[in-house]
Amino acid sequence: MKGQTETIKLTLEVLTPLHVGSGEELRLNLDYIERGNIPLVVDRQRTLDALVSGDQALDEVLGGDWNLAELVKLAGQDFGYPLPMLSGRSETPATLREQIKDAEFRPYVPGSSLKGAIRTALLAEWLQCNPGYSFQALLPCPQRSRRDPSRTEPSKRAQFAAQDLLKDVFGANPNRDILRAMQVSDVRFQAADLRLADIRWLNIIHVKGQEKAAWRDMASRQNRDNWQDASGLYIETLAPDSAASFTLGWDRFLLSDLTKWGAPAHGAELLPADFSVLRKVLNNHARRIFENEVAFFDQYQATAPQKQLQKLLNRMQQDNESAYLRLAWGSGWRGMTGDWLDAPSLSTMRELYRLGRQNMPFPKTRRLAVQGTPCLPLGWVRLGPWREKVATVQRHPWVEQALTEIQQKNRCQADEALRGAQLADAWQVLRDPELKAAALADIQSRWREKGWWDQPPPGKSTKKALAIYRGDNA
């Protein structure tokens, strides 16, 4: 039995914009350029390799005050990836926060991030199901400051506030941690899954003795009534509906006898034995978050995000095979901690670590991605069974962006934009041969899925579009 790991293959589907940051900030004309009114994130190494391997003299390329756009032009090919806006607008900001990627510019969700979110949910649900477990004694308490004995300070720094509790629940050290028996792989996506998200801060303020929702301007730190008047920030995110596979494994040898490796005695009830049980635990935790967040937005008349969260809650309640989970940047204080503190303990921790303002709800801000209006909460994913898909052409970012712009400009449906001549006209003037070929492959795939390529729907615009794609008017 030693070394026996039971592994299942699952799908991680992104439900709302997901950002796992690299810690780096990308800058215009240093890391990306503007191409077709959207950012083109440049692979500088491949661009320089192309220049050096070509006819361009190395000293001419690297000497002086070089411009990234000029280097890309000299290379004769775009190395990197386009970054369409999630909201559909055409915009190239001065800076943006980078999504973590591998050496090939492919975004991924580290297994450690996914496992950390699972750990948080397991802790919260285990504490909910074991009200007799007294965790208060394991939390930090006030103590006299070493520097100033007249003042008090927490017995532990904020980043270690739950350390004793986590050791008591999961295990005294990494070798004895019950989650050592769970293995989670990285989840690897494609660059085409990335979108540029415009993030805004909804903030609760006091006005004439009453609480109300406003929008935090991140430049001036002032509050605005209209979100359009409040600046936010831009981040790379994995787009909703993007999906990739990963593996989840249970080490059956370790789980066969917890006492041999010093795991906690309650480990068997803490770590679900298979995905079907894990799914129920994660969904119980997700349901609490959904319900609390729906109530929060409803209280402050923030209808757009309230509807999005209610829609996700309804979807989860009708889904009998998947687990719903929130992770990574933007999940907020409650998402990071698991929101398991009772009211007295929360009040104590707020006072001890000076969390939030007195007489105000905590936390009082929410980060929302703009899609027409700030409405999308961040970080929600669905973990479900892996089903092999029939190979299809990858949806191309240029086609996605062009369709969105046509829909917004003409206020038309997606099918109308796809079959119309405006998309064909925009495609026809593309200068990059590789981009043009890839975009056409995507357009053809979409047309064939709807049966239009062989039996086009009636209309002059569709007839013209088909002629352009087939080269009949060349």
Name each region found by the language model.
Residues 1-56, 172-177, 181, 187-474:
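Basic polyanion-binding and macromolecular-assembly surfaces
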Residues 30-92:
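Aromatic- and Gly/Pro-rich amphipathic surface segment
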Residues 64-113, 117-231, 327-343, 347-351:
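Extended, compositionally biased
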